[in-house]
Amino acid sequence: MRGGQTGIDEATTKKKVVAPLRLLELFSGTGSIGRAFEAQGWEVISVDTDPKAQATFRQDISRWDCASLLGKKIDVIWASPPCTNYSALRKSTEEDRLDSDKLVRRTLEIAETLGNPPMFIENPWTGKLKTRGLLDHLRLNLVDYCTYGMPYRKRTAIWTNTAWIPSCPLCKHDCASSRNGKHTARAQQGGPGPSFSQRELYRIPAELCDEIAEFCGRG
């Protein structure tokens, strides 16, 4: 066989190296979303201040320089900004809420720096983030965690710039976790009924994470 032909054959038989899709998980916390994406072959880059989060970057997002990622294509951003100062149950001040607003704005700045890839921002629906006007340009979806396998409802808002729509309708107190029109558990620490640790309450249902990861994987 001629040398030139051999070179062509070798070139055509070489396997193409395909770079993995990448998720940037901001305020990664329990890593619920990251695990779902990793299970589908994605590379996950995470940012959080909590050492328990075992994030790629253990840093305050307000001080984190995302320029180190400019050489890498980020395919999806997920963010779960702290909800404490937005909580209706907490006696937070307007100054507290303004501090939290800065983190949400920083999230949007990072997304813009990275080319505004598909993005999801999650926060409890009972909180006040929805009243701050920061995410009005994004599609708002509501989910109830009980319809995705959790024992409590915990209605949650997910803002996105994608076409994703939850597959499960909102609960009408008729889900598998309801008895006689009431949920058997509440998303709370202490009090009557089952009690959950703070880390457990911060978890995002695996079924919901898988659904979003599958949607993003379809491109």
Predicted feature locations:
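Conserved active-site and SAM-binding loop architecture
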Residues: M1-G219
